[in-house]
Amino acid sequence: MTRTSVLADALNAINNAEKTGKRQVLIRPSSKVIIKFLQVMQKHGYIGEFEYIDDHRSGKIVVQLNGRLNKCGVISPRFNVKIADVEKWTANLLPARQFGYVILTTSAGIMDHEEAHRKHVSGKILGFVY
């Protein structure tokens, strides 16, 4: 079976491990987008440390879970989002105001919707985490 989205597989593995109460999860293959997405999640405290393991193939990532994650997911296709429309997307995707983050890929890098609003940049929507 072919993989349609490496990021979707990674976030699905994290969700499943979190639901079953695991303390860590192995993600393979890895990509730069997954690493940046995990950095945003780590910055907001949804996951603990994560380590990239180079196996001379596609690489692996070991993520330490801390039990704070409720759900994370990918939005496919990656819709273009203007700064004014971010509020509509947060209302649709997140369970409540001031709770969780919509993660965007912008010209200034991968960041959450609040940082994108501060930097006044728009981009494509990658996913959400809460």
From Swiss-Prot:
Alphabetical list of Pfam families matching this protein: Ribosomal_S8
One GO-annotated biological process of the protein: translation
What keywords are annotated for this sequence in UniProt? Ribonucleoprotein, Ribosomal protein
Q: Name one GO cellular component term.
A: ribosome
Molecular function terms from GO: structural constituent of ribosome
> What SUPFAM superfamilies does this protein's entry cite?
Ribosomal protein S8 (SSF56047)
Family label:
Belongs to the universal ribosomal protein uS8 family.
Q: What is the recorded name of this protein?
A: Small ribosomal subunit protein uS8
Species per Swiss-Prot/TrEMBL record? Kluyveromyces lactis (strain ATCC 8585 / CBS 2359 / DSM 70799 / NBRC 1267 / NRRL Y-1140 / WM37)
Quote the gene name from the UniProt entry. RPS22
